[in-house]
């Protein structure tokens, strides 16, 4: 059930990217990063205004309704598929789905990495209270110093179902893969073979920092 909840978030993201690509002419490889940035910006403003929960429902509804509307009203579906599925976007959606299932199976915990920074604690507080975690009573000022962007990104993927540590990893990795897609998207379709080694290089880059 929890896997389906996260897949619903991925589906909403796909619908939002569909609107950006087919209506706003955002390249399919850049659409995931654009959509995630817009979602986090909206949720940050909503959390600051104290209306995070209803606005998140509205974001989901707009993404899903927009995607369905665009696909249902488009006449040339073959052309739509060609625009939506480029080397960069295929890499993104494939990795997003694969790692969603992987983290669901592995169920990684945040306890080994959350002793001081409270990055996972911030997400849990946001999920439980449906409010910006910086306003919570924790007995420590540390949480108030954290940037709300990443916890709210995780909140988007935590929205349905119960809180789970593995969903945080899903949200962060999907953001990570969206950067992959944007870089790979610079490669023309005719040179798709270059995308494979480039993706391998991008995968290794974070391990050097």
Regions found by a protein language model. Give the residues of each.
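Short charge-dense sequence patches
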Residues: 72-79, 98-109
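Internal/C-terminal transmembrane anchor helices
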Residues: 85-105
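Membrane-embedded, hydrophobic transmembrane alpha-helices
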Residues: 1-81
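Lipid-exposed faces of alpha-helical membrane segments in multi-pass integral membrane proteins
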Residues: 8, 38-46, 62-65, 94-100, ...
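Membrane-interfacial entry segments at the cytosolic side of transmembrane helices
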Residues: 52-57, 78-92, 191-195
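Membrane-interface helix caps and helix-loop-helix hairpins in membrane proteins
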Residues: 47-54, 106-111, 209
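Active-site lumenal/periplasmic loops and adjacent helix-entry segments of GT-C-fold
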Residues: 101-207
């Amino acid at each position: 059930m929890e896997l389906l909840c996260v897949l619903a978030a991925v589906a909403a993201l796909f619908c939002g990217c569909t609107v950006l690509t087919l209506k706003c002419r955002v390249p399919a490889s850049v659409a995931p990063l654009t959509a995630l940035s817009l979602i986090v910006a909206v949720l940050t403003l909503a959390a600051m205004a104290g209306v995070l929960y209803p606005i998140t429902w509205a974001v989901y509804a707009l993404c899903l309704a927009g995607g369905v509307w665009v696909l249902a009203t488009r006449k040339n579906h073959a052309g739509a598929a060609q625009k939506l599925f480029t080397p960069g976007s295929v890499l993104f959606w494939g990795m997003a789905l694969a790692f969603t299932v992987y983290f669901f199976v592995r169920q990684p915990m945040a306890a080994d990495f959350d002793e001081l920074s409270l990055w996972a604690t911030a997400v849990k507080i946001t999920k439980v209270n449906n409010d910006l975690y910086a306003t919570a009573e924790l007995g420590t000022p540390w949480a108030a110093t954290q940037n709300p962007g990443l916890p709210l990104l995780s909140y988007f993927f935590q929205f349905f179902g119960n809180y789970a540590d593995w969903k945080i990893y899903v949200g962060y990795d999907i953001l990570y893969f969206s950067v992959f897609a944007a870089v790979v998207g610079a490669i023309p379709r005719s040179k798709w073979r270059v995308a494979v080694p480039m993706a391998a290089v991008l995968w290794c880059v974070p391990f050097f920092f």
